[in-house]
UniProtKB/Swiss-Prot annotation:
It comes from Arabidopsis thaliana (Mouse-ear cress). Its main location: cytoplasm. Residues 1-109, 229-249 are annotated as: Disordered. It comes from the Eukaryota. The keyword Nuclease applies. Widely expressed. GO terms for cellular component: cytoplasm; P-body. This is DIS3-like exonuclease 2. GO terms for molecular function: 3'-5'-RNA exonuclease activity; metal ion binding; RNA binding. The gene is SOV. Residues 17-32 have a biased composition (Basic residues). Keywords: Cytoplasm, Exonuclease, Hydrolase, Magnesium, Manganese, Metal-binding, Nuclease, RNA-binding. Belongs to the RNR ribonuclease family. DIS3L2 subfamily. The record marks D496 as: Important for catalytic activity.
Amino acid sequence: MKSASSEQSVERIENGHKKKRNRPQKQNRRSKQSSVPIEDAHVEESLDGRDSSRSKAKDSTSSSKQQRPNTDELEAMRASNVAFNSMPPMRAESGYPRRSASPLLSSPEVSKQLLSKSCPDPRACEQSPGMNGELFQQIEGSSQRKIFSSHWSLDAVTEALEKGEAFKALFRVNAHNRNEAYCKIDGVPTDILINGNVCQSRAVEGDTVVIKLDPLSLWPKMKGFVTESAAKPEGTNSPPEKDDKKARQKNGIDVVEGFEDGFSKNKSSVIGKGAKNGVTPSSPPSLDSCLGSFCEQKGNCSAVDKLCGILSSFPHKRPTGQVVAVVEKSLVRDSIVGLLDVKGWIHYKESDPKRCKSPLSLSDDEYVQLMPADPRFPKLIVPFHVLPGSIRARLENLDPNLEAELVAAQIVDWGEGSPFPVAQITHLFGRGSELEPQINAILYQNSVCDSDFSPGSLTSLPRVPWEVPEEEVQRRKDLRDLCVLTIDPSTATDLDDALSVQSLPGGFFRVGVHIADVSYFVLPETALDTEARFRSTSVYLMQRKISMLPPLLSENVGSLSPGADRLAFSILWDLNREGDVIDRWIGRTIIRSCCKLSYDHAQDIIDGKSDVAENGWPALHGSFKWCDVTRSVKQLSEISTTLRQKRFRNGALQLENSKPVFLFDEHGVPYDFVTCSRKGSNFLVEEFMLLANMTAAEVISQAYPASSLLRRHPEPNTRKLKEFEGFCSKHGMDLDISSSGQLQDSLEKITGNLKDDSVFVDILNNYAIKPMQLASYFCTGNLKDSVAEWGHYALAVPLYTHFTSPLRRYPDIVVHRALAAALEAEELYSKQKQTAIDEGRSCFTGIHFNKDAAESIEGKEALSVAALKHGVPSTEILSDVAAYCNERKLAARKVRDACDKLYTWFVLKQKEIFPCEARVMNLGSRFMTVYISKLGIERRIYYDQIEGLCADWLEATSTLIVDKLYSKRGGRGFFKPMKEAVYLVSPCEVCVAKCSALSVHDTESPEAVSIDEVAPAVFPLTIQLFSTIPVVLHAVGGDDGPLDIGARLYMSSYY
């Protein structure tokens, strides 16, 4: 197992590292600070009655021509340059096993009344008279109460897609402003803006939708597009409450106070104003004539090509459109985590005695609102009659702790007449301010299976103690006399890779990478294989691991533990001093590791520290001595440095920032964090793992060009990359974006001039990461006519896959099987051709691939027989496996990011305040975005409409002057208290705090950050782009709202 730091250097580029920053919402519990970056697509758990919501949207209504909002309204729309576009669509294979339902969650009435099609069963409305019936009348589609237009029928969708009048896309919501959503169309470089609830037409984050584009004349200007005229600075947009109001008016929705904040279904609560009867008609109108004219100029081309041509001709325009159908519902609909608005319901009940004789009584025709923790989701309506009995009883008893409990819900219906989806509660986790409930909610939300392994999957495991069978000794290459060692984190137990090096005559080296042969134990189509495929990846939390494979395999018989005979897949390269591969050998082996080194141990050896065999160092096994180990580590370090330099000369790109490492007490509770960076020993291991992955990709793609699992990383988003280039040019930095290698070279030159400003280097890397797209697994058969798209942009190589971590990644097991099949095909071919074994064994896995042998009748037969024996999947099956593994890998990363945010929040909650320095990244009249280097996060600070604070924005010089008002503001308007933007202390308090810190500071934790390191600023404060300012971080939410990390200016004043 590799540590998060060692393994993620490539992953940081592969996964794009998209940052998402939340915009404040005017809703209950919605934080006004941005969130820690998380990313996206999930496979959800199986709960009672949830399968129906997983299926594609088959229900549709009759179509009629759809009317659009007027031109003035649409031209008023403004786009947002959010950083989470270019995310690949994902789907789960329905055949994979699901976890069993929680006994808490069953609600028999739901299946009868709520799990409906596009319109609910009228009988459900008859059983719920009064206010609840009025709501369901709206959902049923009363012509005077419709908000959303009917979705197109399946036939209309199919016809529009075939004619190029509509596009299939992935629906993503702006976390800063839920009224803004973006749709990613495959092959189109710019995302489509879907502005407003009506245009979004009940689509939810992660849905696969069909969209209809607006005419070109209605597309707004691209935000951030720089022209010769003075561009409007970022952050100068109107206040969010005004934006929200405009968005509702533009899209024909007026959500009155009774429904927005109340708890009854009022007949007049929602009034559509955009079209007749509040509904825009719904049949597919023709595409803008500009598409047709472009096609006439360019000849016969696809609709995507036409759209790309228009976007290229009008780069300053942001395309807009509307959702006309939801063709595949996102699985995240089934696991939305949030808090019940119990106080709001109680206030509603007590505010009018006519509604209820007693505030304690519950009526089935009422509902309670659920406020999602993720701001991308709308409020949910949970009818009382579908509440689990335990929650309903607590509501009746006015349990004050209920509102602090994290719950999960699934959307069961969203009718055309309801502004919010109807949901049911599926799980109760515990208090939102506690660590364990939050972790459980994170795992549940991302469908991470934390249950025990099934009995069937355990039956195929070998019994312990286990020894290598004699038949394997006979058929494998015996490397037990070779000095093989592992380098891993000190706490690692699943050791899936080992290294060796030998000096050869003539100054050559033979380097070996030995990977645990997991495919020997996990056979295709077994219960264990099904379980591993379902879990897909191990998930690493700070204090525990959720394994993909049972511990008996991942930590015992499959792990390359020191002193034990283990089965391995080995790749041996003969390298010269320039790092060129002269020859190679690939095969199944038996190895015996002589020691388990930690990264710190290996680094001490590289640094030449003496007395390496002192206390605390690992035991040696076999006949080897410490001089053998130290010589191997130093040689490997020198060779890896040569390989690394060569790789970057060939165009590789590396972008990474330092990240905090958490310190835990004996109870596993985080209490502080320190910053750490990767060591040379991390790069040592990384370099050889990259070489092994590239070698495996080359072999399997040549042997099985239609059914190999590779990993591709597309080129960055062109528009965003050009924006980054313009940003650097504006600030006097030359950036070459013509290739990954040129980008790396120019970044190194820029950062070389900034050696004394590591924070700005981090900011520059953050900007460089944002244009990067996600890396993903794919089946070569799906791109057989587009071999150029197989490449990996960040690594600058044409072929790449994952081979080196089969104990924790299912794709690696798939690759092992293909490699085993190629090896066996070589043996079969040599027997059929009656050639020498050395000549035959080199034809498919050697450094020179024998294409003639592979295309011969004997070669084809050998490859086919071997593929069948080792379970090499077909193109169709492998495509589904790739898509599912992409989804699970993304979910695992979300869990990791969410846990990082949770641990940070928990530390800040205990500290109460955390003063630190921040660097201003964006600046405007309403808010600034700051980068906190100690935590590697970005945060927004809003300072508009703050009582007692004056924020003067000087647009000509892009300067902000923040001062304190010493008289109350005149005029009307809502102003937030100063404490929301400024943490204000007096100079006397600062002196007292410093003295207290000196007396009570924990001397046992010298790495901990204390309050006396950062001094507050004074009024007036002048701020420009890249200014360093003091801020105070604090924990937001917990028991009373979603978790977040808030930032405020840290100021000092006597008044």
